[in-house]
């Protein structure tokens, strides 16, 4: 992976291969070497080539392959490296040694044979070994016989030669005249005194180990070119000055020759010359946690995917992918060696890390009886006009009730009373209070049910009376009032009122004390917000002071049946408005006097506390958790789902049987529909309420007693009031069917299809939808803005985002294939343009890239100067490379194009880049072109680590910060990586040091 020339060559080879595949079938190549139709020499090798062959002479021969001649290595000046004789053989040579020598292990040197070591050399008495030969010696009183091995005892008197004083060095011969004549053994010459014998080169190579030359003074020894003569003048020893003494590595001259040694990581072999690499991984895995890879003279630890090597270069630590930017769209869970992305409720995972909204309405219409509206992360069922309101299960529609009395429902209550100059007010919510803490300094409380946004009732005037056209039409819109109060220097928090104050409030707000007792308040919405204001010069509030603002919305019912001849609906509405306004005036005074209570779930809460309280009261408010929270250690934690905050015990209590709570931090639980006080404790939603009809059943309200779904219908959910028909006249094999799969269809549809009940055929899922199951009557729409490449998709994994990814900044950025790290879609084209600031150039790092090789380069990534095919190309590839590479752009600007075919797909890429000062171009080029940057697996992992690549970019983009960088990040990078960069950066920044 690298420059544009290599991928270009690959494309050319693929093109040639494709054309050969089209036109070359008829002209099939013949292997002449196999058939024996070649005319190569017997000492040549036949090598087949397309449409021909070639002949190559074997090693040790020379020629054109059709005529080969043996090379006589013994004719070389160094005698082929042989120290004695060289014997040429066909295609090779061998070294031989003179008598008295044997061939060394290297096959070239000759070493002395110690003849005395075996059978005493055949000597009768003593044997003396010499270089290239040996001699037999006799003890005193004996002399050596003519056979030079046995010893003869000398007589005291007798023949001359038997006399011990005959004077011959070797052999004594008696002459006819009674004298003696001395002779020498073979290989010796008689000296001028006719008694002594002089050694020549013909005996034992003159005592020389290598070469011998006869001189008047005797043999003169010499050595082969790779050796030097020892101080004894006979032995040849190796020297470090010549060919490093034959050592593989380090050589030391010693009295006995050379002494070879090996560096750390190598072991000296038995020949005392060769160094062999030590495989450290064989012993205890080299101390590596995961993977040990032996290298020449050393070893390298590496980690499994999902782990990183620590600075001790032995231990592996899990990579916390969740700490990276852009790892997951929603939630990220780190796991050993990997991670998992999770999506919020109502969203579905696609492309490994992305979350898209689920269109629940495409899944069997969301289970809704009538209409379904998809919303981000959820959906909502709707009921058409005349079909009643939405059922508690959120999917069915209840039958409209024509005449419903407003007296039966629990109402909210605004109670105010005056005692002297003090006004005391309380907002009471008997049930279904919704408490929502919006922030640390704010909350909202709602009570009752807001009026629907409906048109006013049609009223028919008949004489002096007013009559509605029907009971349903007689509903009159309620009177609405909205007020806003501001309290300075107050905290916007609810605090449980102490017992004494609560009893006092009960006396003040006793029976009959409600000035608006005939005001049927149906809905209350209170919003409280505290904030610091007054930071500006013109602000009225002093800087740093807190301001609490209360916003109250009230709805009061107006009864049409209370109209009289003297007061119609407009009159009733005006009366109600005056009463509400009067109550709000008293409410304002009670708030300013800190005499306002909020009654929720039978407990009284003070809404806001002004700073005029006593020290004891203020101390009581310190570190107090707000309602809906309990203390867990030193923190305030909201009560979880399925519980409510019990103000008296200040604890979270599970919802009683027959109730549920879907929200956190609530002050009460909601009653289950049709509750008979049965069911589990701590129910978290309405579906867990007891007594619901199970799947395959229905009832009028969704609760028992239930009826099984009749044949030809089904119901997959609990608590429903109806069953869905199979459609198309289809029936089911039994009652109580729970799925369309129970419908007796005429054909069985496989995944990627849905059953059309109108034509009773299986239809392929359209592009942008999928179906993973058999025998279904719908296809699920792909999440978010994703789509599929083709129709008939069977999995959400085939849903892909077609948008080109990346962020293009002036100094740093990245490009990303669509749907990364999931497989990219087919038939897309992406174009990115990188335009760096003036006097800056572009550095690209490709950590890894995945493109299908079997696609015949249908998916291509190319980086050029511009869109013109003839412009300067920086990088081009159509293959997968998991080995990272860094390179500089060959042009100041880059036009990047990624195009995919309709065939195979792969993960694609995420490629970061950085722009650097052109003054450092030489340094940056020196770094990224050094092969050592990629030789080590640990260095490669640096280029893949999203955190380290940022740090690496700092060095490459701003080399002057290198030394500060190494101190700051020395624990992040392996020593070998820092060592690699140190010399380059130092020599560039300090060229004269």
From Swiss-Prot:
Keywords, alphabetical: Calcium, Disulfide bond, EGF-like domain, Glycoprotein, Repeat, Secreted, Signal
Superkingdom of origin organism: Eukaryota
CDD domains (alphabetical): CUB, EGF_CA
PTM annotation: N-glycosylated.
SMART domains attached to this UniProt entry: CUB, EGF, EGF_CA, Ephrin_rec_like
Segment forming the signal sequence: 1-20
Main location: secreted
Keyword flag Calcium: yes
Entry protein name: Signal peptide, CUB and EGF-like domain-containing protein 3
List of glycosylated residues: 417, 464, 685, 756, 785
InterPro entries, A to Z: cEGF (IPR026823), CUB_dom (IPR000859), EGF-like_Ca-bd_dom (IPR001881), EGF-like_dom (IPR000742), EGF-type_Asp/Asn_hydroxyl_site (IPR000152), EGF_Ca-bd_CS (IPR018097), EGF_dom (IPR024731), Growth_fac_rcpt_cys_sf (IPR009030)
GO CC annotation terms, alphabetical: cell surface; extracellular region
Domain EGF-like residues, every copy: 29-69, 70-111, 112-148, 157-198, 199-237, 238-276, 277-317, 318-356, 357-398
